């Protein structure tokens, strides 16, 4: 090909392009053209009707040939023989150019599936952005745009749709192309349209129905490539759980809100089932369906034993469980106690558990070639008398719980069957009796229950009323009534301790037990210092009547002490490590809300919980002995969530069960709260004593 020459003409003619030229009937003379008027053509276009083509006659009067002509912003190409190129490709210096039907070189335009750039040259192996279509295209080596195919360009794969458009931010089968159009090769991808994560593998396809290990965690990609999250997957003969972030649950607990149960997933993510898990310093059991055992019994076939799992799934050990209307005991290894003896260090007593683990109560047990008796609270009778209503006889159980027989105990003869040969354990000449059972009822003359009193309490024989072999007329803590003879044991006032009162010249004390006394009032002038006084009601004495300032105080009246003053009590009385310390505001809140005296509430809680330091207080936030029954105080005591709820919840309970029912003062066994709240006949007196002590320390405002 001839070297291309660009002709830059400063045209002086009106005619600037072939479109404006006219056909001529002139003649050719070699490379020159004579027009119809005989003049020679120069610097102008000529259209030859014979050749049906345009020619350009240069200034030297020869036609342009194998060269470019620029007119204005347009380029034309004159081929060999001078013919103007049109509607065709022209190759020049290894590049291809396209001349349109008017002979103009096309630029920045599509020619079929090819594209010519700004210079007019056909684009080869390069990207083209078409703003008209707002899309990218790629021109291959053959000059045609890629279409319906993948191309690898500079190490990256791209897909071009029908029409050559570059696919971006879309799926193509199992592959995904990002915003730049490049195929994602490996890694995580979040698709907003599907609101899911996908994982692209090394081959460029998404993971489908398979596990992926990434950054130390396993993930599962479901059918369609969707990442499993907050859901269960059954695989490898086991259940697995994928958490909210898609990670497999492993060596951890998961709560499933649908089944409302906890599950544990072992190493590798396998769901634990029919097996034990040690965690949080406790054993847990995962049942056959994987659910954590909770508030239920589980039989383990391997150890052939029953276990109980508490709230939270913790295995019960060294604890009591109330279930099926019976107490059960779980030993240190969690196994249910069954057909065996158990010593409870807290109650310092032995218990026997029958087949099935049921606690024995009010029953005889034959063991070690001897009879043993389990009382109503399940405790083994030891070093004590027991009345058996079935055989209507008294028995004595020695140290170790062995039933005594063919021997004399405390002067009483026992037969070969263990029965006391002397009949009833009463002495009609005795003035005082002691309560034998854990609790015993006091009845009116018609047999209706009046109150109940605790084991060891001393009652007075009321000689003004008639007693018989079945019941004795008694009086205690202001209450007169009758008690079953089988519940009482005669005392010898010359040898046995009988509760009494005594003044030291400053305080008047009630000695309720050997070396145990409580101040109940200030010294009165009518009192003789050092003299023992006896009273059946704690109010009337020989020569004077006692006025206890708080025993009959109306507890619906507010105290005169503030929360801050109540808080000072602990330092004034040198009381440390108390859960009730700095809870004056809570006691005052209870007073305001439930209209119960805050000083009384503090004193009551102090008595029942040893100033907030008892085991029941620490373990259960129970400071008022709520449902702490005499037979099972710790086990039956109600549990509160925290200290404040323990105070407020108990106050509400006291209001509903006592204050609202007219028992608005502490009282004794004849009237007031003491009638039913506690079996201790001096419970009210003891709380009143604490109130008196606090009142004195705080200045006597009440």
UniProtKB/Swiss-Prot annotation:
One of its GO terms (biological process) is cell wall organization. Residues 1-23 form the signal peptide. Keywords: Cell wall biogenesis/degradation, Hydrolase, Repeat, Secreted, Signal. SUPFAM superfamilies: Cell wall binding repeat (SSF69360). The keyword Ribosomal protein does not apply. It is found in: Secreted. Its main location: secreted. Cell wall-binding repeats lie at residues 42-63, 65-84, 86-105, 124-145, 147-166, 185-206, 208-227, 229-248, 250-271, 273-292, 294-315, 317-336, 338-359, 361-380, 382-403. GO terms for molecular function: amidase activity; mannosyl-glycoprotein endo-beta-N-acetylglucosaminidase activity. It catalyses: an N(4)-(oligosaccharide-(1->3)-[oligosaccharide-(1->6)]-beta-D-Man-(1->4)-beta-D-GlcNAc-(1->4)-alpha-D-GlcNAc)-L-asparaginyl-[protein] + H2O = an oligosaccharide-(1->3)-[oligosaccharide-(1->6)]-beta-D-Man-(1->4)-D-GlcNAc + N(4)-(N-acetyl-beta-D-glucosaminyl)-L-asparaginyl-[protein]. It comes from the Bacteria. Its EC number is 3.2.1.96. GO terms for cellular component: extracellular region. Plays an important role in cell wall degradation and cell separation. Belongs to the glycosyl hydrolase 73 family. This is Putative endo-beta-N-acetylglucosaminidase.
